[in-house]
């Protein structure tokens, strides 16, 4: 009897570890992998906006973004698929003190994440960022935000090419 209890406790104790080992193996966790790599980011006129490094971390559960303009601005994001809610999440922080929380998922072949910030004046701004993989291996990032009248405007349009 005692051995049976010990065996049951041992199996129960190992179950979370076994579950955690395969926690991010589902195909949904790979939906944003097209963004992985070392990138040069250019504006539509071809000027270098910055560089971006996207790595897979924490056993493939997290995409870690490190963006730099090479000047006074840089930022990082953590991206993950929340399997419980079936949604992608991004937390962005940068040298301007900004915090941007986005959520969404695949729309066709593009990753579309949306969120909202509130300015010091209490004005809410909606954000929508779309990453679209291209057949040549590049990725377009189109960031839109709403103006004071609620109209969508392009905040950033960048083309990612592998370094």
For the regions a protein language model found, what residue spans apply to each?
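Hydrophobic small-molecule pocket/channel-lining residues, especially in calycin-type beta-barrels
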Residues: 20-163
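Positively charged n-region of N-terminal signal peptides that target proteins for export
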Residues: 1-4
């Amino acid at each position: 009897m005692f051995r049976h209890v010990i065996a049951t406790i041992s199996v129960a104790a190992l179950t979370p570890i076994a579950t955690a080992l395969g926690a991010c193996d589902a195909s949904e966790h790979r939906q944003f992998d097209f963004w992985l790599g070392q990138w040069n980011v250019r504006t539509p006129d071809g000027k270098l906006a910055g560089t971006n490094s996207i790595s897979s971390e924490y056993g493939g559960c997290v995409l870690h973004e490190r963006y730099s303009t090479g000047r006074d601005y840089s930022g990082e994001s953590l991206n993950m698929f929340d399997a419980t809610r079936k949604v992608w999440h991004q937390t962005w922080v940068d040298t301007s003190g900004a915090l941007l929380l986005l959520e969404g998922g695949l729309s066709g072949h593009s990753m579309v994440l949306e969120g909202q910030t509130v300015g010091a004046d209490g004005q809410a701004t909606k954000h929508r960022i779309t990453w679209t993989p291209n057949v040549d291996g590049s990725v377009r990032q189109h960031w839109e935000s709403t103006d004071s009248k609620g109209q969508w405007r392009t905040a950033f349009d960048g083309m990612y090419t592998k370094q």
